[in-house]
Amino acid sequence: DLEEGLLDSSKLPRIIIDPYNSLSFKKEKDLEFKDTVVTLLIDNSGSMRGRPITIAALCADILSRTLERCSVKVEILGFTTKNWKGGKSREKWNKLGKLKNPGRLNDLRHIIYKSADTHWRQSKKNLGLMLKEGLLKENIDGEAITWAFNRLKKRKEERKILMVISDGAPVDDSTLSVNSGDFLEKHLKQTVKSIENK
């Protein structure tokens, strides 16, 4: 208990209980700030159309500007599929005789709106591409998280943070029509668990 310094908020309840107790202070100390990079991975699926994708783009813009002022590098990524209801992946599966349990049957589209080494001012217009008509299709979250994580782990920064902005579970009609109904969700959970254990 010091007489001056930074207010010790952990001791405030005792002042509320007994207002005659004196305020408690603690000594300020400068901590070394770890070199940090943040990756924002944004769901660019059709269910995000309208207000949700607008809010996600605004959040990415605000977070990027704010964190860069604190010397934190920010990467902004997006994920969707190239097609509705399959694409070359599904065509290939059809040509090969429609094998059982084929796995993913859509082509991925992973987008780099802003790389970590690019300043916000140079890439702010890219965020508007999220609002482009026809971009938002389906979402295969597990593979997108793996992609973002692999990009992040190549970075030299000491502290690495991956944030995902999404409105729900992964959905790809082409994949789910021939695999189990929870195929993509199970893969997502396995992916997250695997990354958390590294």
Task: Give each language-model segment a name.
Residues 1-198:
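Acidic, glycine-rich A-domain
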